[in-house]
Amino acid sequence: MSFTVAVKEEILGQHHLSWHELSAIIKMSGSIGLSTSGLTLSVVTENAKLARHLYESFLHFYEIKSEIRHHQRSNLRKNRVYTVFTDEKVQDLLSDLHLADSFFGLETGIDEAILSDEEAGRAYLCGAFLANGSIRDPESGKYQLEISSVYLDHAQGIASLLQQFLLDAKVLERKKGAVTYLQRAEDIMDFLIVIGAMQARDDFERVKILRETRNDLNRANNAETANIARTVSASMKTINNISKIKDIMGLENLPVDLQEVAQLRIQHPDYSIQQLADSLSTPLTKSGVNHRLRKINKIADEL
């Protein structure tokens, strides 16, 4: 099950019926038709639970007994598609939900009453996500929430609702419609709180924390590996120089303070500067050992 499906099923599992949620779903996934008896309304979804939810909402709010039809897609995904269909009280339903104008091209945004009411806004966002929302799986590490709209002004209305909850929503216009999106993990988690998907929010945060912990460990390991590589490289350079000095002039001819450092470096090529400093008969600071090693390298360069 994808993360998006898990979020939607959590919302639908709460069995809350909302007038504003229904308004968003119909506006974003509904289509109007004409029959001999008048207007018809069809709402299409690939989610069986959402289809059942719509059926219950029509019955609860308008005493409409709709039909749930289904067919199999013929494309590669071959998903089952559900259509919730009714030809009862369609004009009344559209007028009541302030949707009639949007279907006839006069009003494509979001009703001001929804934009100005927090609880109505929450319910509308919930419906919008159920209809056309998606969240990229947090395991991917690339956080993205999208809600697709047919009309640009509707996408901007969704963004306004999200911004009222202090979420950094942006809108991208496409050839066919527009997308309202969030990209920050914290905004996506807050959105899940807004629509009441608390379990999904906790799951998202858990995955995020695990990913960040793994990344921190990887960075630490990479840094440690790089430090070891630098230490070994510097050590080998010094060891080669000490061997050169030994062959040409003999280590015994080095100044006394350099002889012990040279011997220790040959005996312990894997030692860090601090380990060398601690191993001297008279312990030195790291800078003191570095100073002596630089002297040894300089002597070798001059030979």
From Swiss-Prot:
Protein name: Probable cell division protein WhiA
Domain of life the protein comes from: Bacteria
DNA-binding region, residue intervals: 272-303
Cited function: Involved in cell division and chromosome segregation.
HAMAP family the record matches: HTH_type_WhiA
Pfam families per record: HTH_WhiA (PF02650), LAGLIDADG_WhiA (PF14527), WhiA_N (PF10298)
Recorded GO MF terms: DNA binding
Entry keywords, A to Z: Cell cycle, Cell division, DNA-binding
Gene3D superfamilies named in the record: Homing endonucleases
Organism per entry: Streptococcus pneumoniae serotype 2 (strain D39 / NCTC 7466)
Gene: whiA
Family as reported in the entry's similarity comment: Belongs to the WhiA family.
Lineage, broadest ranks: Bacteria, Bacillati, Bacillota, Bacilli, Lactobacillales
GO annotation terms (biological process): cell division; regulation of sporulation
